[in-house]
Every structure is written in structure tokens, then in C-alpha cells.
Amino acid sequence: MSDKDNKTVGRRNLLTNLGVTAVAGLAGAAVATPARAAQSAGFEPARHGNDAWLGELAGSHRVFIDSSTLEGGANALRFASNIIKSHIDEYEGKASDYAMVVCFRHGSASYGFGDALWAKYPAILGRGIDPAPTSNPMSTANAANGQNSIDSMVKDGVHFAICKRSSRRIAAGIAEATGVTPEEAFAEIVAGAIPNAHFVAAGVLAATRAQEYSYSLLYSE
């Protein structure tokens, strides 16, 4: 056999071996993929009483809008309204079709506090806003929130997740400024929260737990 013939046979053997390997790989993938799918389908997240309210909100669609800044908190109202109005206009739906949660955490946490608290502690709650407002800026429909407000959101059935860790940080500032204990200040915050408020262990934690209850997650900037 000539050198040319030897090279031809060698190439054929190589291609044959590669073909066998590829088929074996595809067969392995065909076997492994259903196994992985079954593993994923079999996952059931642990349930906790603190999160039960997420599963109790009525609606055929679930959305969790997260925010962590003053601007993001205002836009969260805008986005919640846009979703609901678009659903009504384009899908012939209604606001009650949505289990909608807006999260105020970190820099937007004080939006979860009612007007009486803002009137009492404007410099603390309005930190970063000049001049410091004496009522919750989200109590009024304005350009920042797309002409929506806390009350208009509540009328549409929207609920609010308020970060407890951020609220406790603010309570510590109130305690330092007024001489009450941090626990007393935090209790006042909880009592003076906006309607439909749920104080969650941490806003970031609530955002992850909401997804375990099949909420779509949107971050508002």
C-alpha cells in the first residue's frame, strides 16, 4: 500500500472514531438532560410563615418591583401603574388581576412611612432631599412618580414590602436624636407605616423569596 493510501485509510479511521464519539456524546446528553430536568422540577423551596403573605395575595399575575434609591422608589410606582394600565388597555384586564408588590429598601425605605412620621422627623426621613419634605413625597402624584401616589397604588391593590433592616437603621437615628430607645422608635415606625405595608426581614431577602412564590422580578432605578 502506498503512503497516499495509508494516509487515506488513517483519515477514514479518524473520522469514524470521531463520529462514534459524537454519537456517544449525544446519547449521553439525551440521557442526562431529562435527569437534570427532573431534578429541577422536583425542587420545592422551604416555606416560612414570615413569607406567607406573598402567597396569599390574589391575582393571576405576580410582580415584585424592587427599589433601593429615592429615584428608584418613585419610579417603582410609575412602573407598577404602567404594568396595570397596559394590562387593562391592551389585554382587557383589570387591576385585580395582579398580585403587585413594590419594595422600599435601603435608600427608598422611608417611602414606606406615613405622613405623620415625615412631619415629625423630616430631617431624618428626608435625608438626601433638599429641602426636607414634611410629608411622604410619594403621598402626592407628581412628575417623579409618573403622576401616581401611594393612595392610587393602594386603590389598584398594590402592596408594599418595607425593609425591616433599613427601618431599624432609621429608628436608631430617631432614637439618637430624640432620646427614646431604638425599639420604641421602630415600634412608632411600624405603627405609622403606609397602607398595605408588610415589614420584611430584609428587602433583598423578600426579593428572592418572592421569586420562590412565582413573582416576576423587576428592579426600579
What kind of feature is each model-predicted range?
Residues 29-61:
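C-terminal segment of N-terminal export signals and the immediately downstream linker at the start
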Residues 75-92:
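Histidine-anchored nucleotide/phosphate-binding helix
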Residues 1-9:
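N-terminal secretory signal peptides
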Residues 54-70, 127-129:
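Acidic/histidine-rich, surface-exposed loop or edge segments in extracytoplasmic proteins
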Residues 93-117:
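Acidic helix-start/capping segments at beta-turn-to-alpha-helix junctions
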Residues 116-139:
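A charged helix-plus-loop insertion that forms the helical arch/lid used to bind
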Residues 9-31:
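N-terminal export leaders
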Residues 133-221:
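A cross-taxonomic marker for long C-terminal extensions/tails that follow the last structured domain
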